[in-house]
């Protein structure tokens, strides 16, 4: 078996020799985590080559590529404008966004590379170890293993809530910050918990007007900016954006309402007739109509924080907005890059650079932490003991499904879809045993119908057999 990559010209550009695939796909960092820590947690591994590396390495991660992915997950990821989603069923990771990783129960973060780029390490993660692994070219590569010093378990609790309809009106970076403070639920909780508005302290450091002004001043030979329309004539455009960031912040490039169009037929004809067109531009003009997906977004310290935009001609997931993470910086960030990798015509409803200060982060995480013991996940069951100082909505960071049922101290409890994709139950003050069990929705009815079908088939067989013998 050979794993390979085909470039735009239909030429094999990268391959892994048969028999070597497992060496490349098996992550030595994950192996060490599994050996050293037997508790329950998730891992995020950036720049992994395989889609379902969690299955290969037998460890829970935040990456998934399944055709049966819950719509709750894909819809929430799109609402949060996660830049690392690709089609509705493929979430590569959580794009190093500290809050999302915290709420998903991520305890360890791994990155490959020849150097430690601190901007690709989320807030609160400390270097634990440096290991050696195999790169895709079969040479040795480094894996840096980080541990979340503020890690929440897969179970945490809220004192307050907000309705999802109110949450939907927030910007994606404020949505993430809101979930660190209060639970997001679908409906009014009728007095079980107090409704509250989250505190949002994000700061827009470059708005669309300033951003477009910076693009116009660049005067690149392969880019033209007219009004809000950006035309990339050929190749890739990489533009430095200088700004005054905020210290102790996670910085994001937020692009909303992405609209991409191929070159018009008139433009193509005009360009191909021109005598001064370069060979590279000619190739890009000819190939442009075949572009169905490409990257655009941010670059920081030569690390790409891009979004894989899909046109309507590809496996389109409908996402037209993205939040690209420039990373956490202890000092204020002064410059980052914006890039568009495909020739064509771009417009954006909004494009801005936003800083999310982490000043209150430790306080939020501390408040979410519960006294949880004996947390166990086995097959279709989850159980744990919780000691609560007051009434809480206890969130379990496992994907919500109608197939789950819950009990508190042996009595049935209502499951509340929490934060768009997780499960929650409301429990009063005191010591409690929380249990979840899962049965595939429709399994009982399906089994009954299958059994009925077999009984009918057998009955008909017996009837026809008797008639035949009688005749």
Which positions does each model-derived feature cover?
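Conserved luminal/periplasmic juxtamembrane motif of membrane-embedded glycan-processing enzymes
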Residues: 1-219, 234-235, 290-350, 354-360
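Active-site-proximal, structured, solvent-exposed surfaces of multi-pass membrane proteins
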Residues: 202-471
